[in-house]
């Protein structure tokens, strides 16, 4: 490849590994891979390598796992690779300005939203939570701000009524590598056209928490159904019954008006468990009691009908 670039790749989860895999078949020269240190995982808390490390070692690439890139000796690891560009995908560490300035073409990042909408940690989840009609990926030039750099390339993706964060993650993991390879070609041949972000259109994708995922029946059924899809597969929307957390995997919206207080169980049938909300009715379709597998509302009613007596209120 005549316009082959020397690339440092920095990333950690599976989403990042899919981008590294695309780079390795693109004709560019990946000269080093940075990923987060091995972390304890599973019941035995055994140290586990990141998906990016697993792929990099499988391909015989040099792997670096600093806890931080602030120390001078760790920055020197980057400098010694003499890269044309550093590609950053869900790395999880802050890149100091000294590192951002090292590669000839700077550092670029693959972000899971159509910037400037949803800067921050949870862009995929927040696009669902807000009811956006579309999302996508943005390849941007990195600067010292949080997702504030100039945009180099964007690819859009429609959000369907069935999408969860899990399904949208997979869609963007397919789109991202396409955009990345196109952007690298433009950088290599000098045709990249950076575009500044419109600050008037900025929204922030705050991190998710388990407490936020607790179902608040005062919200509308439409908003709660969005939350259930946005928080799937993590942290999972949940409610509490008899002191036990019950996860909600799937629900639908019934637009009918109700005079019942939010959280009131209106009906419990094989078609679902219908609960009054701040506006409309939420029909619970798939739930998971603590220590059990996810099951249909009908199966849960067969074993725990006393949990869902019409007229009772859910907390």
UniProtKB/Swiss-Prot annotation:
What residues does (6S)-5,6,7,8-tetrahydrofolate bind to?
113-116
Question: What are this entry's molecular-function GO terms?
Answer: methionyl-tRNA formyltransferase activity
EC number(s) per entry? 2.1.2.9
Q: Which UniProt keywords apply?
A: Protein biosynthesis, Transferase
Top-rank taxon of the source lineage equals Bacteria
Protein name (record): Methionyl-tRNA formyltransferase
| PROSITE patterns in UniProt | GART
Under CDD domains, the record lists: FMT_core_Met-tRNA-FMT_N (cd08646), Met_tRNA_FMT_C (cd08704)
Class in the EC hierarchy, top level: transferase
Instruction: Please give the GO cellular component terms listed in this UniProt entry.
Output: cytosol
Family from the record: Belongs to the Fmt family.
The protein's matches in Gene3D superfamilies, at most eight in alphabetical order, are given as: Formyl transferase, C-terminal domain, Formyl transferase, N-terminal domain
Repeat as a keyword of this entry, yes or no, is no
| InterPro entries according to UniProt | Fmt, Formyl_trans_C, Formyl_trans_C_sf, Formyl_transf_N, Formyl_transf_N_sf, Formyl_transferase-like_C_sf, GART_AS, Met-tRNA-FMT_C
Purpose: Attaches a formyl group to the free amino group of methionyl-tRNA(fMet). The formyl group appears to play a dual role in the initiator identity of N-formylmethionyl-tRNA by promoting its recognition by IF2 and preventing the misappropriation of this tRNA by the elongation apparatus.
Per the record's keyword annotation, is Transferase included, yes or no? yes
One Pfam family assigned to this protein is Formyl_trans_C
> What does it catalyze?
L-methionyl-tRNA(fMet) + (6R)-10-formyltetrahydrofolate = N-formyl-L-methionyl-tRNA(fMet) + (6S)-5,6,7,8-tetrahydrofolate + H(+)
